[in-house]
Amino acid sequence: MISVAYAADAAHAAAHGAFYTEPHFWVDVAFILVVALAFKPVSRAIAAALDARSAKIKSRLDEAHKLREEAQEMLATYQRKQRDAMKEAEEIIAHAKAEAERLAKQAAKDLEVSMKRREQMAMDRIAQAEAQAVREVQNLAVDVAIGAAQKVIGESLSAAQTGSLVDNAIKDLPGKLH
């Protein structure tokens, strides 16, 4: 079979001439030359495009990495600020509680002092009222005694006796006033 195919190709070659006279041959040669000549610049262009794309991707990755680091730093900063704010808030609350306790104790002391002062004022008023009541009772007793004495003296003493009693009372008055 090979011999039959070879013979057919040989007959075909003899009828058409040598292989380099065939247009298919020259198309194939031209294609191979174009591909061979274009391969180096095209491969360089493709390599350059791939390198540029690779550099661009690397740049974006570096930028993304940098942004991620910045975001982590910002997160850490905000977390630190939040912790500081929470600590400060706790300190403020503790201070406010201590201040409230101090104010409550002070208010209790002030209330106690005020109550004692009011109690003392009430006791003073009671003592004044008592003293005034005693004076009024004494004055009333003196008035009653004077009235009774006048009545008794007026009924039992004569005018001469009354005059001598008044004179004696006036003489004794400076000694009794001191």
From Swiss-Prot:
The keyword Protein transport is assigned to this record: no
Membrane topology: Single-pass membrane protein
Keyword Cell membrane: yes
Residues passing through the membrane, by range: 29-50
Keyword line: ATP synthesis, Cell inner membrane, Cell membrane, CF(0), Hydrogen ion transport, Ion transport, Membrane, Transmembrane, Transmembrane helix, Transport
GO cellular component terms, semicolon-separated: plasma membrane; proton-transporting ATP synthase complex
Pfam families: ATP-synt_B
Localization (cell): Cell inner membrane
Function of the protein: F(1)F(0) ATP synthase produces ATP from ADP in the presence of a proton or sodium gradient. F-type ATPases consist of two structural domains, F(1) containing the extramembraneous catalytic core and F(0) containing the membrane proton channel, linked together by a central stalk and a peripheral stalk. During catalysis, ATP synthesis in the catalytic domain of F(1) is coupled via a rotary mechanism of the central stalk subunits to proton translocation. Component of the F(0) channel, it forms part of the peripheral stalk, linking F(1) to F(0).
Family, as annotated: Belongs to the ATPase B chain family.
Record protein name field: ATP synthase subunit b
